[in-house]
Amino acid sequence: MAKTPLTVTVITDTHYYSKKTGTKGKAYDAANAKSQKLLKYSEELLRAAFKQIKEDKRTDIVLLSGDTTNNGEIEAHAEVIEILRDLKKSGKRVYVLTATHDYQDDGLTDSFVGNEKVKIPAAKREQLYDMYKEFGPDEAIAVHRDSMSYVVQLADGYRLFALNDDRNLSGKSGFSDECFEWIKAQAEDARKNDQFILAMTHHPLIAPSPIYELIGKNDMLGDYETRRNELADLGIQFILTGHTHVHDIDVITSDRGNTLYDIATAATVGYPAPIRTIVFDPDVKMVSTTTDLITETVDFDLEGKTLQEYLKYQLIGMVKDMIKAAGTDIPTLADMATAMSIKKKLIYKIGWLIKPFAKKLNALTIGKVAKLTRAETGLKPEDYADIADKSVVDFICDLVVNLYGGEDLYSVDDNEYKITVGLLHIVDSVFAALHIKPRKLIKVADSFTDFAEPLLHNSGIPSYDAILPIRPFYKEGEQGKKPQEEKKPECSVKKSKKGVPIVVCGILALIILLLLLLLFF
């Protein structure tokens, strides 16, 4: 039976924060000043996004995939529910998932009064279903009550699987085995009835970059490597996610040959404040996604900037402060690192190693790095004269913007790209000379070039606007072909031959140091 194309609007991670819980004073500043989230103005950002969505006539379906509130504050829930009701009154159909930021196990969270943190009521997990049942569960054709997951018939031939992953009963996010059996039964029923499945959950199943997979592994969906293959083999080919605050689209293919696209949308409350629109058209085997940024006027002072410039300034300021702290104050760095999904204990563990490098980093320029990589890049000083004085810290900020914003700031032809890859090739050559495989250390990539290069350039699916082919589904017992990987653009940077000389010089320096110690001590 022919299916009419279905269009949906997607936002996530609104982190709504009630002003009643405090937006000024030393306690608030200490807790939130170094965050990428613009909590103080989360209401203004959400209202601007919803005004824009109300005026968008492409669809009446709006999906929110979790972390609706900042930390589960009862006041925040009450206020955001009224804003969601107002969106429904405009004629929109609104479907909401809650997630880990929407409740506290003890029913308490922090508010800020002057210099003090004061405990206030927060929602407990068991309260959330009734609080949000008018945004999805009330019209569900199936509900898994314990996980608060539900299935809705969005239109003829289309079902939404809203899969709550806030716990898997094994100490992680994700789905319990019992919940997954329910998902499996619902997927089988959908396929039997010729229903196209659109799924949404909160935590990502595919990391937006190798670096994120290493430092933010605990922020991925629990058992993601297994679950993403299982979901693909259930016929769930498209899943909408959030949590990372990174705008990204990625894809995996299961061993059986089935496909899963993870379409991640960045947070409304941080850079770049996107609204994603997706059109599903099974009859032509195509899904298209486009991204709009919040452009409605917001009710706070942007200090002469556009909204995106203001949010970018917030993000970059946080990164610069982190790099400064890395060279001077490891406890402060540990406190700040949680805003980027980096665990405090990891910072304390490697802080001694980070500190001396961070001190040098704060004074380093691209020109100085370029001199080290001339043999690899073939660049002459006049080739990079326009960027020679650019701070490496500013360049790192560009990479963070690249990651969170889903942008593609550098191509393989840009000198910043060549210089960075040249440096990474030198590092790889040192490890090769030492016969050490980088994967043993970094776990998620075979080389340091493969580990860091995706921060420079996205050679995969565009994060903002993309056409995604709907691929065939293979039942159990069938075997599909894995699609050919797209070739990466040719890069002119040569592999480095400096590894052996660097290792030899290092060994000689160590021998000389030991001899001096023996002679004088």
Language model feature labels by segment:
Residues 56-61, 159-161, 170-261, 322, ...:
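His/acidic metal-ligating clusters that form di-metal
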Residues 1-74:
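N-terminal active-site segment of His-dependent metallophosphoesterases
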Residues 1-9, 20, 147-162, 192, ...:
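Beta-strand-turn-beta hairpins that frame and shape the catalytic cleft
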Residues 13, 66-67, 99-100, 202, ...:
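Active-site glycine-centered loops adjacent to acidic/histidine catalytic or metal-binding residues
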Residues 5-19, 157-168, 198-200, 261-266, ...:
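Active-site-proximal beta-strand elements of phosphoester/diester hydrolases
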Residues 1-3, 299-521:
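Non-catalytic terminal accessory segments
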Residues 74, 79-182, 188, 256, ...:
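Extended active-site neighborhood of metal-dependent phosphoesterases/phosphodiesterases
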Residues 12-45, 110-116, 169-175, 211-216, ...:
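Acidic/histidine-rich helix-loop elements
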